[in-house]
Amino acid sequence: MGFTDKQEALVRDSWEFMKQDIPQLSLRFFSLILEIAPVAKNMFSFLKDSDELPENNPKLRAHAVKVFKMTCESAIQLREKGEVVVGETTLKYLGSIHLQKRVADPHFEVVKEALLRTVKEATGNKWKDEMKEAWSEAYDQLASAIKAEMHAEAAA
């Protein structure tokens, strides 16, 4: 079916609202990833040997903002382009790093759950099943693009 006009509007409107608080929402997003899957901590060089709270770790904060913004902004592009558009070099890098870290399907599901919970918390009473479906579709498209690049690199 693809990404509909209505889904795009839901993602775009909620993203415009969330952009006001990117640093805090990004930290919440990453905290949820670590809460859902504590072993994920070992996948990040800046977290491996650290017991610091996420909000006190500047490398985590910077990474969280980058990941959260890219995820949300690629969702916005989905309707415009009909596919997730991430720069070719960025996509190659994402595929490469995810392959190196041995990221598997369950890891993508953890990130998806954390993203959906973050958006739900941020949007409050605006959160509905339709919004959940829109963000799910957008995230699934981004994850598929990263996985395709991972497979391409593994086959090379």
Curated annotation (Swiss-Prot):
Q: Where is this motif: Homodimerization?
A: 35-39, 105-117
Name the Gene Ontology molecular function terms of this record.
heme binding; metal ion binding; oxidoreductase activity; oxygen binding
Name a single GO cellular component.
cytoplasm
Tell me what reaction this enzyme catalyses. Fe(III)-heme b-[protein] + nitric oxide + H2O = Fe(II)-heme b-[protein] + nitrite + 2 H(+)
Q: Which residues make up the binding site for heme b? A: 45, 59, 63, 98
Question: Taking every annotated instance into account, which residue ranges of this chain make up the domain Globin?
Answer: 2-151
EC number from the UniProt entry? 1.7.2.-
Q: Which SUPFAM superfamilies match?
A: Globin-like
Localization, per the record, is: Cytoplasm; Nucleus
Per the record, where is site Homodimerization? 132
> Which cofactor is essential here?
heme b
Q: What class of enzyme is it?
A: oxidoreductase
Q: How is the cofactor bound?
A: Binds 1 heme group per subunit.
Q: Does the keyword Nucleus apply?
A: yes
Read off the InterPro entries from this record: Globin (IPR000971), Globin-like_sf (IPR009050), Globin/Proto (IPR012292), Leghaemoglobin-like (IPR001032), Leghaemoglobin_Fe_BS (IPR019824)
The answer on whether this UniProt entry bears the keyword Heme reads yes
Q: Name one Pfam family in it.
A: Globin
The protein's predominant localisation is: cytoplasm
Q: Mind listing the UniProt keywords for this protein, alphabetically?
A: Cytoplasm, Heme, Iron, Metal-binding, Nucleus, Oxidoreductase
Q: What does this protein do?
A: Phytoglobin that reduces nitrite to nitric oxide (NO) under anoxic conditions (e.g. during flooding or in waterlogged soil). May not function as an oxygen storage or transport protein. Has an unusually high affinity for O(2) through an hexacoordinate heme iron because of a very low dissociation constant.
Subunit organization: Homodimer.
Entry similarity comment: Belongs to the plant globin family.
Supply the name of the protein. Answer: Anaerobic nitrite reductase HB2
Gene encoding this chain?
A: HB2
